[in-house]
Structure formats: structure tokens, C-alpha cells
Amino acid sequence: MIRVLFVCHGNICRSTMTQFVFQHMVNDQGLKDKFYIDSAATSREEIGNPPHYGTVNKLRQEGIPVLKHRAIQMTKQDYKEYDYIIGMDAWNLRNM
């Protein structure tokens, strides 16, 4: 199984949207059983919060399922657990 983690500052906008879009693409290709996809934050600011309403609205507008999600912070263990950890911008990469 390929394990992918998307990371942004708060885990309520970009990384969450990317997680849901990528999951939708994987599911559409019939590859759901080959991937584990998640997202996380570099900061603690939004821990426990749901996706931002703007993110949810845009996903629904595009017909992409909004999955159950609460913001989490990435950990050192994630480097061992995931095959790919993808930061959403240069600042995120520095903070990872």
C-alpha cells in the first residue's frame, strides 16, 4: 500500500483539499485499496478543527466528496509511516 501525507500550515484548507481531491482521483481509477491518504498540519493552531467552510464549499461545488476530518499535527513518526510527505508550499517544507 502506498501511503501519502499532504501537509500545510493548519490542515483545514490546502492539505485537506488536496487529500480529498487525490482520494477522489484514486477512487475513480479503482485504486482505493492501493493507497492510504491523509493530511496534517505543521502548526498546532487548528488542531481538532474541521475543514474550512471555503474548502468544503469548493469541494462540493466540484463534486468531490467531503470526508470526515479533524486537523492533526504531523509527527516525527510520520516520516517512518508514509512513503510520500508532500508540503503545500516552501514555508511548509521548512517547517516539516
Predicted regions and their residues:
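Conserved active-site segments centered on acidic
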Residues: 1-81
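Glycine-rich, N-terminal phosphate-binding loop of Rossmann-like dinucleotide-binding domains
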Residues: 89
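Alpha-helix capping/helix-boundary segments
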Residues: 92-93
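Helix-loop-beta element that forms the nucleotide-linked donor phosphate-binding surface
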Residues: 96
